[in-house]
């Protein structure tokens, strides 16, 4: 079974945002980190937003962030939501468009392949995005995410209501 690029990119966006933490990331940053087309990512991000997994903030200072509950999503949930087809062979087709096979009435291969697919999803369902994003420090450096520097303002001196004076 091979996942589509769309699903691959969806998982990558979700992992990037999970590692990114607080603050907003941009599609351009994610594109640069993975070397993926920005246009492809725009489609992916739109869908992730529609699913309610990613908060998309529009505007000049906009960007993306993962909703906290999304860290509890399993890889299987993401794959199921972003893949269109899990038919491993023609006789699995759900839309009735199966290719006729002369051995279908006696075929045991279909059951073996169905069990393999189910085992694949069982494994994906064991892992959450939050689990895969930890420890974030190793992924942060690989993805080129720069930590946000927090600058704390100095408290004003007690009894002083005036701002600090400039040195002449």
Predicted feature locations:
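Key DNA-contact positions within bacterial/archaeal DNA-binding proteins
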Residues: 39
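A short alpha-helical element within helix-turn-helix/winged-helix DNA-binding domains
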Residues: 27-34
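Short helix-capping/hinge SLiMs at alpha-helix to coil transitions
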Residues: 18-22, 68-69
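Beta-hairpin "wing" of winged helix-turn-helix
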Residues: 52-61, 65-67
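Short, hydrophobic-biased segments on the C-terminal half of alpha helices
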Residues: 14, 45-46
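C-terminal regulatory/oligomerization modules of transcriptional regulators
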Residues: 75, 93-168
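Short amphipathic alpha-helical elements of helix-turn-helix/winged-helix folds
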Residues: 13-20, 81
């Amino acid at each position: 079974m091979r996942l589509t690029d769309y699903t691959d990119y969806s998982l990558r966006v979700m992992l990037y945002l999970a590692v990114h933490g607080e603050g907003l990331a941009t599609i351009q940053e994610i594109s640069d980190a993975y070397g993926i087309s920005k246009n492809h990512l725009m489609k992916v991000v739109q869908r992730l937003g529609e699913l309610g997994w990613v908060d998309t903030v529009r505007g000049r200072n906009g960007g993306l962030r993962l909703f906290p509950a999304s860290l509890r999503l399993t890889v299987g949930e993401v794959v199921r939501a972003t893949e269109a087809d899990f038919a491993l062979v023609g006789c699995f087709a759900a839309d009735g468009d199966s290719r006729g096979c002369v051995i279908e009435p006696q075929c045991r291969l279909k059951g073996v392949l169905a069990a393999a697919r189910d085992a694949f999803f069982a494994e994906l369902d064991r892992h959450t995005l939050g689990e895969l994003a930890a420890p974030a420090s190793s992924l942060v450096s690989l993805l080129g995410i720069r930590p946000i520097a927090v600058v704390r303002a100095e408290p004003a001196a007690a009894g002083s209501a005036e701002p600090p004076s400039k040195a002449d």
